UniProtKB/Swiss-Prot annotation:
InterPro entries: G_OBG, GTP-bd, GTP-bd_Obg/CgtA, GTP-bd_prot_GTP1/OBG_C_sf, GTP1-OBG_CS, GTP1_OBG_dom, GTP1_OBG_dom_sf, OBG_GTPase. GO terms for cellular component: cytoplasm. GTP binds at residues 165-172, 190-194, 212-215, 282-285, 314-316. Monomer. This is GTPase Obg. One of its GO terms (molecular function) is GTP binding. Residues 1-158 form the Obg domain. An essential GTPase which binds GTP, GDP and possibly (p)ppGpp with moderate affinity, with high nucleotide exchange rates and a fairly low GTP hydrolysis rate. Plays a role in control of the cell cycle, stress response, ribosome biogenesis and in those bacteria that undergo differentiation, in morphogenesis control. It comes from the Bacteria. One of its GO terms (biological process) is ribosome biogenesis.
């Protein structure tokens, strides 16, 4: 099993601003406030798409933003609610808050959804702020900011196809040709120290996951080299592509190589030998390779290996690669699935401790700076374009304990106070 992980940024839409407006119609002398509410901002919603197998699409787009709600209008007209931004993920995706480590959810069933960033509510228009003392309020709210966060998507991927063979037979090269994976490639044993994973996408829309499994050597089933670790990966694949190199100068016989790998696979688990297998002769661009392949193919046919399961390719010239991939996709259609044994997972309890609602600090120039989720939200929703709105915001600050907090921090009348990009003077 391989873990595919990616971090993405999500920004939900801001709510639409409420409107300050008054009813002005002929024969209606005291129409009163008629400012409508803003529309709700769009949320970011993940949903399970059973057609997806990997998180590959997130390699190309890692920032997602939903639309803002429409602003309120006069005549008590509400702003348009924004559409939610829906993002497809494969089944088995675990979603975690990148900053806190909190698991937001596990998406396992087709159609299952998870809201990862909630859209802001629309600000209220002035029709909501009528009181006996203020029958014509010039007060409205800006839309609430949408949630913004970084999330980690983690998917445990089972490879559909496993590339097996001796070291340096061309597994990593083939993977790099048929996928966008960039494995480390060199001509020495155990170049691949961890399995490389790639998605093969054919021109007919078919796709499957391919794993380049590190080269096996004699004794792998007894743990020689990195054998046992990699044989565990092999047992989870549905189809094997068994690569055998035809290089006349490698000092080995192709049929002996083929038999040795089959022996190690069988020694580890007989059931692996029952998996569908395509035999792939590699490095066919080398001089003398054609003659070696003719003898190798004849020996395989004599053993009962189907002719349409034997391929010759050159990853250098791409010869034979496309037919091999199409045959692999065809075999996969009828290949059974193999569920991995679930290992116990050790988990640690984690509880996120939110920041204090209000924090007062002082800049080098003497300005007192107010921070905290609650106060910043109140500021962003305050419409300070009208005196009534500014007075309402001042009352909100006082009710949150801002005045007392500033005094405790040493603020005196006339000192400057900043919230975000807004600066005002503290008055006792």
């Amino acid at each position: 099993m391989f873990v595919d992980q990616v971090q993405v940024e999500v920004q939900a839409g801001k709510g639409g601003d409420g409107m300050v407006a008054f009813r002005r119609e002929k024969f209606v002398p005291f129409g009163g406030p008629a400012g409508g509410d803003g529309g709700h901002g769009g949320s970011i919603i993940l949903y399970v798409d059973e057609g997806l197998r990997t998180l590959m699409d997130f390699r190309y787009q890692r920032h997602f933003k939903a639309s803002a709600g429409g602003n309120g209008q006069g005549k008590q007209m509400y702003g348009r609610a924004a559409e939610d931004r829906r993002i497809a993920v494969p089944a088995g995706t675990t979603v975690t808050d990148a900053d806190t480590g909190e698991v937001l959810g596990d998406l396992t069933e087709p159609g299952q959804t998870l809201v990862v960033a909630k859209g802001g509510r629309g600000g209220r228009g002035n029709m909501h702020f009528v009181s006996p003392k203020n029958t014509a309020p010039e007060i409205s709210e800006n839309g609430e900011p949408g949630e913004h966060r970084f999330i980690k998507l983690e998917l445990k991927v089972l490879a559909d196809v496993g590339l097996v063979g001796f070291p340096s037979v061309g597994k990593s090269t083939l993977l790099s040709v048929v996928t966008q994976a960039k494995p480390k490639i060199a001509a020495y044993q155990f170049t691949t120290l961890v399995p490389n994973l790639g998605m093969v996408q054919l021109d007919d829309g078919t796709d499957f996951v391919m794993a380049d499994l590190p080269g096996l050597i004699e004794g792998a089933s007894q743990g020689v080299g990195l054998g046992i670790q990699f044989l565990r990966h092999v047992e989870r694949t549905r189809v094997l592509l068994h690569l055998v190199e035809m290089d006349p100068d490698n000092g080995r016989e192709p049929l002996d190589d083929y038999d040795q790998i089959r022996k190690e696979l069988g020694a580890y688990d007989d059931n692996i030998l029952k998996r569908p297998e395509l035999v792939v002769a590699t490095k066919m661009d080398l001089p003398g390779a054609a003659e070696r392949f003719a003898d190798f193919k004849a020996a395989l046919l004599a053993r009962g290996v189907a002719a349409d399961h034997i391929f010759e390719i050159s990853s250098l010239t791409h010869r034979g690669v496309t037919p091999l991939m199409h045959k692999t996709a065809e075999v996969l259609k009828t290949a059974p699935h193999f569920e991995p044994k679930q290992a116990a997972v050790k988990t640690a309890d984690y509880k996120y401790q939110p920041e204090p609602a209000l924090k007062v600090t002082r800049d080098s120039d003497g300005t007192f700076v107010l921070t905290g989720d609650k106060i910043e939200r109140a500021f962003k929703m305050a419409n300070l374009d009208h005196e009534d709105g500014a007075m309402r915001f001042a009352r909100q600050l006082r009710s949150m304990g801002v005045d007392d907090a500033l005094r405790d921090a040493g603020a005196e009348s006339g000192d400057l106070v900043a919230i975000d990009d807004f600066t005002f003077e503290f008055v006792e």
